[in-house]
């Protein structure tokens, strides 16, 4: 009990039903197992998953932070969707076949080395797979991901992946959306890692810690097409498109705001190429705007009135300002309201203007600001008007007198005497060509059609054309439509004055065309128009234009700023409180550049100078002008309506008479020169700065120090050091390859040596087997039956026999003596046996015979069958060593017999079991290295196949001719090589011994076969008589059981045969003494031929002994 408590407290915890129920109670789940769809078994120390058979309804199983080493025990969780096994000891993904609905599998922080068993065939709906913090390394370990067709979220972070082939594997996952690869070495190995993975994974939306937007994919594709330059261009295009979207959304919001007031769309579209410096300039003006907003509108109007009342005239100007004062309205935002006029005050206003000054208040829509800059090298814009006695002619009057001349000046009174209908003064002289103003007014035709003399003078006086700046070219190319001034005259004809560039100069062209509704117009407004009448809003609006010039930074009156209002168009921009929508630039130029200051010195009052500058800059704020036709009688009906809301329609500003005088007083010639000088200086500065930077950049990198890792390095030394390191790496690689190559060559040389030794052994075995085959072929040849020699053949003795006759005389004599003794003994025995009983004789003879005869007689006793005796493998002892003492000497001279005796002696010493034991023992010595040697044999076979077929080679040496050779060849194949070179000699010795033993055994078996064949083929007859060896081949019927009859027949046959052979032997001995016996192959079967006669002495002696 104590041990169980200790194991439960400290040892690995086992997952039991009781522990699972306790976990359910702890987490407020159901005690009934099948009612739970989620189960928390985490942080419990379990070492195996078990006892979950009853929880068949689980959909989410938490098993993290345990000691689980194997995934099993989930056979009954068929509805499982989420399985969390992180922070365990799992080494293999397995046993998930039953979880077909698994959607999320978390196996992070385990010991997994290979991804397997999670393909679409096993987990068909797997969507999320987390394998972070494992031991994945090569692409082979990750190749199974190709079969995960529905995995869209994959986490492989913090593994050991270092094979860049994983890019192709991830590219094959068509549904992959989210990928995490941080913490792997391959991240640093893949060039342009993020772009490469975005290009390979077509549907990837999130990579590592950042999302993949359409812009990232487009930039990656551009990088693939044209490198980093194409990527930069694509990124710039996307940025511009995003800016356009932002502007469109803002403009849409502003349009909705204006539409709410019942107004048309009057928003200005921002330029795509708007300078970024405007934002910084707006920031600089913020400080001044704060000071401006602190003042009230009443104070601002008071200051404006003081500016224009420095030289008041009678009651006219005061009346005007009184009207303005009564009609102005102020708010907290500094916006003014448009002054309304009434029909009743039109005539009164005209009279006031006549009394004060010949100038009229003109409502004007200024031309584009680009026209101001284009007036440097061309004629001033020509404003056209046509006099008419019945109608009010719309005109622009430019006063040539000084503003400070006062009402007492003659020019001032002369201007007062002129009727307003006859005042048409148009100044056409450029400040560059005329030192003073032309006081004579010019007619409309003179303005439109200048004389040839004037044209020639203008061409001669004009300076050499200067190239326009890039900003000017940009403006001219993008806003050609703004360079045309359309003017309506009396006969409903429209005169179009177009400014075109030619050779760096701007040339005005005048065209006559039908009137257009979109032309720019000028309109005369009397002082009576400035009234509090509540008429309907007018339809006079400004056209939306964009200011692109870098030297002019002006915000149009139709801009979408919340602080703008119509009232800033009514007053000059002198007072910033009343006109806060203007941003001043130091390089601004105006339309007043066309005017030339008179010979009188300019006014030195700072207030008046500031007013002139402000008015000059204010004139370029407008873009268009309208000249409307109106009859004198309808002039009183002309009204200006004020909108009812703060964000109302835009109306054309009204310019004061005093402002016009100040505009004429000061010339912009100095400003033009200053602007040109500044432009030239800025251009020179830019060029100098570029040249200076180019000189500072020395392209000779070899003489410069480069920064690497925060330290300076000499370029040459660093390059040499890097080259040296690369060379060392290359040399190390070459050394490794060379060492491996030497190892392979040594291994191949060793194989060659072993094969050479084996081939030598094969050659020796082949030679020996060839000798055996030749020997067998000689044995198989049937000997021809010898014929009875005639007298002539007896006389013809071969020379070889004569040569060897002397050497064998003594042997023949001994043989004759031995044959005589055998014959006499046989005859004596045959006489004795004839008188006695056959059985008793048989017993006596068997008892008194020698050891050889006893063996033979024992074999033919009545209890043995004669057929069994004759067919017995044991050879019959037919030789009596006492009677034939010198027979061995005769056969020892025969080489075949000697070989047979040697083989027989070896076979007697070494049995088949012993040979088998030797081979088995040799095989057992190499059993431990069988696998390695088998691989080596395979390499040897592959090496030799390119030269010859080894099987055909072995067949050629006749190794398959015998089963023993096949067995031994198998032994040689398994043990022909050694693992260590020192064992080669011992293996060769073992093989040599085994070959020798095999040769002996083979020779023994082959010689036994030879003996069997020789017994069957040794029936040699002379005249139809059989030899003595026929005794062994006599077939006895199984029914013949009378041994006595058989013995009688044999005895009679032997006696008759002996007598005949003795006579023939004596004759042969006398005639052919010393003849050499030839082809003596077997003692039992080969007859001895002397002079063509056949001796069968041994068989006859055996027969006599048997008798």
From Swiss-Prot:
It is found in: Cell projection, Cilium. Residues 258-281, 428-487, 500-608, 780-810, 834-855, 1070-1107 are annotated as: Disordered. One of its GO terms (biological process) is axoneme assembly. It comes from Aedes aegypti (Yellowfever mosquito). LRR repeats lie at residues 34-56, 57-78, 79-100, 101-122, 125-146, 150-171. GO terms for cellular component: axoneme. Residues 428-437, 581-597 have a biased composition (Polar residues). It comes from the Eukaryota. One of its GO terms (molecular function) is dynein complex binding. Its main location: other. Residues 446-459, 531-544, 844-855, 1098-1107 have a biased composition (Acidic residues). Cilium-specific protein required for cilia structures. Residues 500-512, 801-810, 1083-1097 have a biased composition (Basic and acidic residues). This is Dynein axonemal assembly factor 1 homolog. Residues 184-223 form the LRRCT domain. Residues 549-560 have a biased composition (Low complexity). Keywords: Cell projection, Cilium, Leucine-rich repeat, Repeat. Belongs to the DNAAF1 family. InterPro entries: Cilia_flagella_integrity (IPR050576), Leu-rich_rpt (IPR001611), LRR_dom_sf (IPR032675).
